[in-house]
Structure formats: structure tokens, C-alpha cells
Amino acid sequence: MAAAAVGAGHGAGGPGAASSSGGAREGARVAALCLLWYALSAGGNVVNKVILSAFPFPVTVSLCHILALCAGLPPLLRAWRVPPAPPVSGPGPSPHPSSGPLLPPRFYPRYVLPLAFGKYFASVSAHVSIWKVPVSYAHTVKATMPIWVVLLSRIIMKEKQSTKVYLSLIPIISGVLLATVTELSFDMWGLVSALAATLCFSLQNIFSKKVLRDSRIHHLRLLNILGCHAVFFMIPTWVLVDLSAFLVSSDLTYVYQWPWTLLLLAVSGFCNFAQNVIAFSILNLVSPLSYSVANATKRIMVITVSLIMLRNPVTSTNVLGMMTAILGVFLYNKTKYDANQQARKHLLPVTTADLSSKERHRSPLEKPHNGLLFPQHGDYQYGRNNILTDHFQYSRQSYPNSYSLNRYDV
């Protein structure tokens, strides 16, 4: 009987214990990935600042990042068996029709090339800002991304926000203004470059949602496509700006530093590539709000590590402005999350009559093209749990929902 009792107790507690153990392992995995993400992000930014302080060629750093992305992603895509992008349909009927959906003929010039140009311009602007101003201040200015997204969504998508969302932007504005006024190493070109990079990231995030939703391309596959196309914008700029400046200056002091500089450029490119992959991995393990909190924490870590390692002079008021802006980003994400949860409750039908009513009042249907759905009249639809990040729009695949739902800026 005692043995039976023990056996029964083991049977009752076994699944719960296994579930608890699995949850602990999952939590440990997320924590380890977050710590690695923070270390790579902070280390990469410090390395970028060290490079640009001694080797003032920001386009070269951006080119190394793009090349690292193009070199590192294809093996990863093959290892993870990420499906290839759908083929582009021709102007007429294909003699060998594809078994899957096709992309429209103007997909690449209309969507991919503008996004690739945005990736190129945002990367160059971001490195110019790190070159001109401290890393801590550049990342504080990046905290203005929610402001840009709200403004651009209002202008482009005619999307209105709730009063709470607008109020949540006040700490971000106040923090950035306070950090700007008290920044001891302020540079106007650095501020303009950081704002331009943030604006470009915001536009990229908005329109990459449409591409991901309409094309059904995997986000890492799209990231690889954008990186390969961005090289064509980057190389001419590198030749005209960095290479020509180096050849004209004929400064041979760089020659003996080349091995060290090349090593730092390789480390910087690897850190940037690894950040993208780890950010994707974390996003697929946690909720959108948890990801936004992790990303805001990452920004705090980058600012803190850069202040400790680079020892740029700051005041207590300056630090207060930085932290206020970062906490404002978290408040914005929390407000958006609450608003989205409330909106989702209203979207769920309670009765059959509610369901029929929703069907009657549905917005214009998406227009099919070669098996894909492309929205009419700008009524864009996107997948759930879209997350705005510093470098690329990652999307957790799920059921379609409206554009205004589940968007978080970090």
C-alpha cells in the first residue's frame, strides 16, 4: 500500500515537476540569451566608438556590417531550413508555372530597393552619430523612435492614437531634451545624424511590416535580401567618401594600425550580425511586452557600459535625462500593450449576430495577385506581435490582425 501511495504520488507530481523543470530551463535559456544580447550590443557599440575615434571612416564600418550580414546569414538560413523567397511573376503567363505563390513583377523595385536604401542610409547615419557624439547620447536620441513612429503613422497611415499613448511620449521628449541641453560633448552633426538614423529606422519598421505581410517572406530571408541589395548602395558611397578621403589624405600613420583596425572591424561586424540573430531568437521565446522590456534594458546596459568603458564626461542631470527617455520608451510600450489588449477584446465576437455584423462592416478585401494578398486603398494588414527594433522589423508569425495592434517601439 505504501508503495502504491508512493507510486500514485509520483504519478500525480510527475507531469507538474516536468512542466516546472521545462519552464525553468526555458527561463534560463532566455536569461542567457538576453545576457549575451546585452554583451554583444554593448561591446559592439564600444568597439565602434574605438574604431571611429582612431579611424574616422563611418561608411567603412557600415560596409563591414552589411558584408558580415551577407556572409553570415546564408549558412544560417540553410541550417535552419528557412524557405526561399517566392519567385517573381513575369509580365505574361509562365511556361513553367510555379507550384507556390508568386511575387508581383514590381515587388523588388517598389518594396525591396527602398527598404535596402533605408537600411544603408540608417546604418551610415547611425555610425556618423557614434563618430560625432558619445555612444550614450546617440542611444538616448534613438529613444525618440516611438515619437517618429506615431507621427509617421498619423501622416502615412492616417492612424490615430489614444490620449494615453500621446501622454506616454512626454517623458521621452523631456528626457531627450534634458540630455541634449546637458550633453558636454554635444555636436550638431551628431544629433542630426542620430535623428536621421532613428527616422529612417522608423520608416523601415513601418514599411517592412507590409512587405512581410504581403510577400510571406521569412523575416531572416528578407533581412538577407535587404543586406545584399544594400551593398550596391554602400560600395559607391564608400568609394566616393571614405576611400577617396583616405587616398587624398595619404596619411601613412594608418598603415601600422591596419591589422588592429581590421580585427576591430571584423569584431564589430560579427557583433552586429549576432545581435540580429539573437534578437530574433529571443522574440520567438518571449511575449512582445517582455521583448520590449528586454530591449529597453539592453539600451540601458549599452549606455552604462559605454560610460564606464569610454569614460566620456557626464553630469548627474545628463544621466537623469537619459534614464527618463529610456523609461519613457518602456511606458509607451506598456501603454500600447494595454490599448492593444483592450482593442482585441472588442474585436472578439460574443454572439453570432456580432460575428455577422463584423463580416458586414469589414474593410475592403485584399486584392489577390498570383496567390498573394495585396491590400487595396492602403488598408494594410499585418501579422500579430510585430516588434519594432533598432535595426530590423522582426515578426512573430500568427493570425492576421489590424495594423494598429501589437506594435511596440524599442
UniProtKB/Swiss-Prot annotation:
Q: Which GO terms describe its biological process?
A: transmembrane transport
Known InterPro entries for this protein? Sugar_P_trans_dom (IPR004853), TPT_transporter (IPR050186)
Q: What is its main location?
A: membrane
Transmembrane segments in this chain: where?
50-70, 111-131, 133-153, 165-184, 188-207, 222-242, 252-274, 282-303, 312-332
SUPFAM superfamilies attached to this UniProt entry: Multidrug resistance efflux transporter EmrE (SSF103481)
* One annotated Gene Ontology cellular component of this protein: Golgi apparatus
- Provide the positions where the record notes the PTM Phosphoserine: S363
Query: Topology with regard to the membrane?
Result: Multi-pass membrane protein
Domain of life from the UniProt record = Eukaryota
Question: What compartments host this protein?
Answer: Membrane
Q: Which GO terms describe its molecular function?
A: antiporter activity
Record-linked Pfam families? TPT (PF03151)
Q: Where does this protein have coiled-coil stretches?
A: none
Q: Which UniProt keywords apply?
A: Membrane, Phosphoprotein, Transmembrane, Transmembrane helix, Transport
Function of the molecule:
Putative transporter.
Family of this protein: Belongs to the TPT transporter family. SLC35E subfamily.
Protein name according to UniProt: Solute carrier family 35 member E1
Supply the source organism for this entry: Homo sapiens (Human)
